[in-house]
Amino acid sequence: MILSQGTSPLKGDFSRIKFSIASPESILAHSRGEVLKPETINYRTFKPERDGLMCEKIFGPTKDWECYCGKYKRVRYKGIICDRCGVEVTTKSVRRERMGHISLAVPVVHTWFFRSVPSKIGALLDLSTKELERIIYYEVYVVINPGEPGEKQGIKKLDRLTEEQYFQIITEYEDNQDLDDHDPNKFVAKMGGEAIHMLLKNIDLDETAVHLRTVLRESNSEQKRTDALKRLKVVESFRKSYEPHKKSRKKPNALFAEDDMPEPYVYEGNKPEYMVMEVIPVIPPELRPLVPLEGGRFATSDLNDLYRRVIIRNNRLKKLIDIRAPEVILRNEKRMLQEAVDALFDNSRKANAVKTGESNRPLKSLSDALKGKQGRFRQNLLGKRVDYSGRSVIVVGPELKLHECGLPKSMAIELFQPFVIRRLVDRGIAKSVKSAKKLIDRKDPVVWDVLEKVIDGRPVMLNRAPTLHRLGIQAFQPHLVEGKAIQIHPLVCTAFNADFDGDQMAVHIPLSQEAQLEASLLMLSAHNLILPQSGKPVTVPSQDMVLGMYYLTKSRGGEMGEGRIFYSAEEVRIAYNEQLVGLHAQIFMRYDGQVDQKFDAIRVMETFVEPTSEKAAWLRKQLDEKRMVLTTVGRVIFNQHVPESIGFINRVIDKKVAKELIGRLSSEVGNVETAKFLDNIKEVGFHYAMKGGLSVGLSDAIVPETKAKHIKNAQRDSTKVVKEYNRGTLTDNERYNQIVDVWQKTSNIVAEESYQKLKRDREGFNPLYMMLDSGARGSREQVRQLTGMRGLIARPQKSMSGQPGEIIENPIISNLKEGLTVLEYFISTHGARKGLSDTSLKTADAGYLTRRLHDVAQDVIVTIDDCGTTRGLYVHRNIEEETSGQIKFREKIKGRVAARDIVDTVTGNVLVQAGEIITEELADSIQETAGVEEAEIRSVLTCESKVGICSKCYGTNLSVHQLVEIGEAVGVIAAQSIGEPGTQLTLRTFHQGGAAQGGISETETKAFCDGQVQFEDVKTVAHTAMNEDGMEDVRTIVIQKNGKINIIDSESGKLLKRYMLPHGAHLACEDGVLVKKDQVLFRSEPNSTQIIAELPGTIKFADIEKGVTYKEEVDPQTGFSQHTIINWRTKLRATETREPRLLILDENGEVRKTYPVPIKSNLYVEDGQKVLPGDILAKVPRNLDRVGGDITAGLPKVTELFEARIPTDPAIVSEIDGYVSFGAQRRSSKEIKVKNDFGEEKVYYVQVGKHVLANEGDEVKAGDPLTDGAVSPQDILRIQGPNAVQQYLVNEIQKVYQINAGVEINDKHLEVIVRQMLQKVRIEEPGDTDLLPGDLIDRSAFIEANRAISEKVRISERGDAPARIQENQLHKLRDITKLNRELRKNSKKMVAYEPALQATSHPVLLGITSAALQTESVISAASFQETTKVLTDAAVAGKVDYLVGLKENVIVGKLIPAGTGLKKYKTIKLVGEESAPAPVVVEAVVSHEAEASPMVEEEVAE
């Protein structure tokens, strides 16, 4: 591979790297000499052998400034080549860069190009890998030129011949051997690398390309076209590798400085024959070291062994050729040489890999050195070890300020030693470096003073592994502490995900001035208070601090000093200190500022002040006029730390309130004030947690007395269910679901009662309740298990794919306070163990997801301010989502730029103008405005920047609440924001001890709020049935599939909530009535889908035959039978077919309605039975997802969405709007037709047994599913286009994070990733561009290719044009017009032309793995996965990596092109204000001194 870097050698600055196949000339140009012997070093002297693999003459001296024989020593002989031993006198570091070579006796094929899929050599020669292998490994001859003998025998070029056939021709035509090799009449056939070399050399790439394009255009055979396309891709790759170099002939060399280059060579692009090697490069010896161990043994790199085998076999082959050995022996030796070279380049590909002697492991070849986690890319280039760093255990430092950390003295002195030594010498305390070191070793007191001065104002960086997001590394101001542990501030623990049970952290020292500046300005912990993933604060008090603040601000009736009136906060403080009022006493205080409270002060006041008294009247007036506030002593103390501009916080401070408050502070008063506030409330929190002395005893867990009664009721209900099952009215599935339901409800009732009991205990001062209510520790779920009942337990799942685990139907009735019986204990161990094993297994999955996300988005950087697009994304107000606790409308538009004016449709007011940022205040007002149903916002998904994205489309940077700056690496932030909670999700299970949560299948649906009922698409029938008491009961039953009930505001008509009506639901309300909150709207059966009669008539079974399409299951306990439809295909012959369905006949026996019955349905009617509208004909059981809060279902779901996988058993989706009709029934499928009014018809074949959602005559829209199953994102893209699929992916991923884990991620981050998944298009028709059909290319490259030919025309008739103009060529329109003018002037025939045909394409949705591999950057893709494949393809095509992403720049050791590393900052120089000269002079200053200071203060000339 050749590295190229534009215009200057690698040691300077380079802007791109070109990959290509190394020609023999380039290998020789890099080489310093030929390695002739397999020896490495002399076993006695330990010095390298001459001409061996470690030879000093070739690779340079092993000691600095000393030749091999010792004739020249010392630096003064620099550059002299010793006349005795031939070694150049130079530094030993050249042994890291000087290469050698091995000249092979016969050409050898490079295994990468032969074994890669598809095989590059195979594609060029049109040979299969199997056939190639037989030629390369000397099994058959291949015909290179058939000549006359071949023609007579009917042998064509590339035919394979066995040895017998070959010798037969040779003996038959003896004079053939005398002809010259280039004579077209000579018969030539060879084998091995030599044959391949000759064949490849004879290929005319241009001719092959033309031929293959013709086949593509004209062939009717699909197979031929596929093969031609496969070959054409490789041919075009080789042709492309020439293109950029037609102008420049000389090519600078990457591996040497110019004065160091052995001999220039001209780079011509890749030639096919370069894939066969005549010389092999030998890498520098320092990169394959040989290290002496004790006891006279050596540790050596595997590469030395592999090179030795090549050299030994090569030398032996040369000798055999010299002595004219028999062909059989030669052939065997040549094959062994080929195998040795294969092993050297890629040992892992081979079935019989070369193994080591002792441990019998395969040797690590050159490819293995690059591949995988331990390979060069990931181990050494992306993850380097750093000096000036240390690590230690962390402990809490409660007295630290937010921006400080405690650094142990012993660690600090070690880290800052060079700086301390310099200070000691400068101040004259120590005479020399050596004596300064002695002072430090003695731990002289003066050293500590100097150290204090050195670290003053120098930030250090702390990092805790795993670093899942950018808050995992933060900068702090160090404080010297005794001991050996690092101290950290309690509030930064959340960001680091640290606790003090033995966690360790690493310390890094930023050395340069620029690094210190960035650390203290950008990375200081006090500047990182907001989570980039959601814009919410991360430095939130937790545990003791929350408990302390909650205890402090809670009120209690009857405390000492209740109802007293105070003049000011100071007065309250004095009274409290003098013990005249209690901490929780309700008092009145003069305050005329803004008050944040959520209670009615006058009503509370009347509970402890006589309402009719004069005092009460006066207080009422004061409270009304907002001149006084009713509060508690504790809240007054708390508010002394709140900045005045925020007002008086008159609420109980729990974790949620604290989080809101910190969020408000950071946006309203800035980070400095917020950091002060945080430090203050930390002190307050800890202090009052101590004052309260809150601890939990066994007596604090109170079990409600009513528990026994509820359990008795539940046991009664479950017995009733079992009885019904025994009577045969329920299936086993329904029995199970109903029993689980009964216990789930009981469990929830008991939990609620125990919670309420705790709440009432000691006026809410029960320590357990306070911990729970404040959010300090524990959850309602845990309280339920302590004082209620443990409830139902999930069975552990077998599969990892996230199928729901069954729930054990016998609940655990005891709670943890009462203690479990042996059986209960045994059942509950299930969940506990599963939690632990899950945690360890899933962390790896989440980590891998994060890695793929990083790789796909690492080059998304904000590059420009505005891309100027007119497109935007429509965000709708979705009532269902908002009321079910998902992301609100305001959250979706907050921090975005409006694409169009947002107008209140009721008043016509413009709320936000196009191009304006929607701030938090604006978003709130839009949320409250009923007249705004949707808003069009700028989005990353519609951004049209060519490279990266623009800041207007991204919107605000969530962590600073301002428009994102140019240079922000938003891709990496997006990947971190999605990956970090992914790891959190994983660790979700074990807190519940495996207790089952999830759907109580609610059979009654109640109104969410007061309002008016409005039916939408509701079709019903009245149905009379017997109720449990034997009385007649008339019910209204829904018979339409997609009906809805809306609840609207009766005055404004605004939609408040929407409910989907299930098929077969019983309505409990009427259209247009007013309902109250929690009034029942409808009842439905949650565990099955019902098939309901819509008309009266008689049932007839069609294709429902016992033992064929249904089985009769007689329940052994009850003796009742149940008819279940079965998969009948297993019972019938291949030609037969069945379609089970129920028919409703009228009196004349005519069919009025047909109902297909899917497999697994249970029939509820008999053949010939009379039915009425609303009768249940059959039930199709649903699989209910009743698993505990286990994200197992979540993580695979997220992965499936990001990888754009087609779900198992996807739904069939209609491609057009139209009406459904059913067609013919085949053996294994039935036809569904969708036809529209324009006569367009689409036919779909549905597998028998799949549940069809659409009925005959139903109207469907494009994109509606016709059958059950998950919709495939690929279908959405095909039918509804890229916008729909982008929205679908973002919403679905959000749902998983929201519902499964309650994690908030801003849509922006998901949009960035989804944008990357849709960056590519697939070429349909290439037109006149040089693209290939089926090519996958970047959308911008596609637009560019079309733009390039937009001004060109294709010549259809050349007329009397000059010879350079031929038919079917492309030329610029203006050139041809000019030429035609000339031709017309000379009365000649003009050129006829037509416009060049543009290419057409369709968008492609790639999963994140393939999107990361398809990236434009070779280096980035190679370091991600499939390293050899990526590099092989890049080398063949002569690809250039322009180093635009972050990863490739890290790998080549440059600053990343983001943040302060942006290119435009390189040429900026800081100039003092008074001395700033005219701009021209500044430019001169800049260009001369640009090297000196890479840091930026002020932008001057670019």
From Swiss-Prot:
Gene3D superfamilies: 1.10.132.30, 1.10.150.390, 1.10.1790.20, 1.10.40.90, 2.40.40.20, 2.40.50.100, RNA polymerase II, clamp domain, RNA polymerase Rpb1, domain 3
Gene Ontology CC: DNA-directed RNA polymerase complex
A Pfam family that the UniProt record links to this protein: RNA_pol_Rpb1_2
One GO molecular-function entry: zinc ion binding
Binding site for Zn(2+) 2: C867, C943, C950, C953
The entry's keywords: DNA-directed RNA polymerase, Magnesium, Metal-binding, Nucleotidyltransferase, Transcription, Transferase, Zinc
Residues binding Mg(2+): D499, D501, D503
Binding site for Zn(2+) 1: C67, C69, C82, C85
InterPro entries xrefs: DNA-dir_RpoC_beta_prime, DNA-dir_RpoC_beta_prime_bact, RNA_pol_asu, RNA_pol_N, RNA_pol_Rpb1_1, RNA_pol_Rpb1_3, RNA_pol_Rpb1_3_sf, RNA_pol_Rpb1_4
Catalytic reaction equation(s): RNA(n) + a ribonucleoside 5'-triphosphate = RNA(n+1) + diphosphate
Cofactor field: Mg(2+); Zn(2+)
Family of the protein in this entry: Belongs to the RNA polymerase beta' chain family.
Name of the protein in question: DNA-directed RNA polymerase subunit beta'
Lineage: Bacteria, Pseudomonadati, Chlorobiota, Chlorobiia, Chlorobiales
